[in-house]
Amino acid sequence: MLFHNLDGFGSHCGFRLFSCIKDGEFGQGMHFPLLICISLEELLAKFGDRPIRLSTANTYSYQKVDLPFQEYVDQLLEPQDLDSLGSETLYFFGDNNFTEWGSLFQRYRPPPFRIPGTTGAYSFGIAGSGSGVPFHWHGPGFSEVIFGRKRWFLYPPEKTPEFHPNRTTLSWLLDTYPFLPSWERPMECTIHPGEVLYFPDRWWHATLNLDTSVFISTFLG
């Protein structure tokens, strides 16, 4: 079920739950402090006039569009249009301006894990219900939901999923997923506010925002 609702955004503070994939299964580990407690009103007051860079929500996202954050929230932060391709859908995730948005990132405490000799890279985003990115892969990292819920679908590196790179995750879920035999289905989970998912190196994954969601990833390496 998908929801478009920002009520309660910023109200979740406390501790977050770290989850990971180990030996092909999801596991849960330690709790550690959650650090971003912020409302949409506060974000708009501080950053509404600041430009953000949007990407298309497809596997190979080449198109970039810059516009003020306030304009994105007012005009584009809507549920996913079922008739639109991922290559036609603009999505705010990554390409962050760490200078202009520095006060936000300074409030964030990443998961206390890293690859020795490297520094993690942050990607912050806000997106509407039903949006997401279709299957792709990259290096390892952590994904945390601050507000809303994000559903994940994952395959190990050696198992390439059946998908179209320019179609949305929502269309894949409706048109392809129901017809996959059980042995062809991905691992999947839904992460909620204060939960953190570790995604391993080169694992295929697709995401689907079940609500209007605020999220941040820490890419390792």
Regions found by a protein language model. Give the residues of each.
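N-terminal accessory scaffold of Fe(II)-dependent oxygenases
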Residues: M1-L6, S11-V196, W204-G221
